[in-house]
């Protein structure tokens, strides 16, 4: 079965460990640990790039599957499941599917188009560490793509492998030299036609690689032929572009608006002008 995978901005993974209320940024303890942190590498399929050219879909394209996970924010998640299951399959990652089913039915949500996955995790921020999907070939052969998560949270980092195993999909991991890439989903958007967007955090977090090498990895694993990188914002600690912008279609970018001269507003405007002036 073919899945088009969409990862929500807020996705919660519950599994074999007790979830921690870790923030989106690194804690002081994590910052100290990260200096000597060695990320996990689960070579379940291939740490080489896909063997044929791939295309990463845009978020506005039709989807066949959406991942949510069940630990907190359950009232909101129930609403998401209720609406999404009318349109496509919902993958619910949880520790106890029976309790999830009970909660859904108690809110009047029918148990249709649902799949349940068990996977451990460290934090709530699966938009940042979850799987990415890419396609190759005339038959749209789906592949899962995995990077190194930019947090010292090894269980989070293994969630893409858990999904790939469940869905019986090949996974290609940019986790081993020379293709090892530290990245985060919240700092990556794509237009479906080969153009990718990130803040320059992607360069800062890969100091052993040149920008050209980073572009090459993104091309090999994600099919990105034009990689636009914008300056980070002075007041946004995590520097994820999904905090202030979204691609709506091939020709439209939605950005956050501040009062004139306030906070991150001037840098957002400067970034927008940089894109408009250089990448038509």
Regions inferred by a protein language model and the residue ranges of each:
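The feature marks the mature, well-folded catalytic cores of soluble enzymes
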Residues: 20-280
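Bacterial Sec-dependent N-terminal signal peptides
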Residues: 1-21
């Amino acid at each position: 079965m073919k899945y088009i995978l969409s990862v929500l901005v807020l996705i919660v993974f519950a599994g074999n460990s007790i979830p921690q209320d870790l923030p989106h940024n690194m804690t002081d303890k994590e910052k100290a640990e990260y200096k000597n942190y060695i990320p996990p590498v689960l070579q379940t399929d291939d740490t080489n790039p896909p063997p044929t050219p791939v295309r990463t879909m845009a978020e506005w394209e039709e989807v066949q599957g959406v991942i949510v996970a069940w630990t907190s924010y359950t009232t909101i998640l129930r609403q998401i499941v209720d609406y999404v299951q009318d349109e496509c399959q919902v993958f619910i990652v949880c520790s106890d599917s029976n309790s999830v089913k009970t909660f859904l039915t108690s809110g009047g949500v029918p148990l249709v188009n649902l799949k349940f996955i068990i996977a451990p995790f460290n934090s709530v921020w699966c938009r940042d560490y979850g799987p990415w999907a890419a396609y190759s070939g005339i038959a749209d052969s789906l592949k899962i793509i995995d990077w190194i998560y930019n947090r010292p949270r090894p269980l989070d980092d293994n969630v893409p492998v858990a999904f790939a195993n469940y869905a019986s999909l090949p996974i290609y991991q940019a986790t081993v030299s020379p293709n090892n890439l530290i990245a985060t989903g919240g700092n990556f958007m794509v237009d479906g036609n080969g153009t990718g967007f990130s803040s320059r955090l992607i360069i800062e977090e890969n100091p052993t690689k040149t920008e050209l090498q980073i572009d090459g990895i993104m091309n090999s694993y994600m099919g990105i032929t034009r990689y636009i990188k914008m300056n980070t914002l002075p007041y946004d600690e995590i520097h994820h572009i999904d905090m202030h912008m979204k691609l709506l279609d091939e020709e439209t970018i939605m950005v956050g608006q501040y009062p004139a001269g306030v906070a991150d507003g001037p840098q957002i405007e400067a970034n927008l002008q940089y894109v408009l002036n250089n990448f038509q």
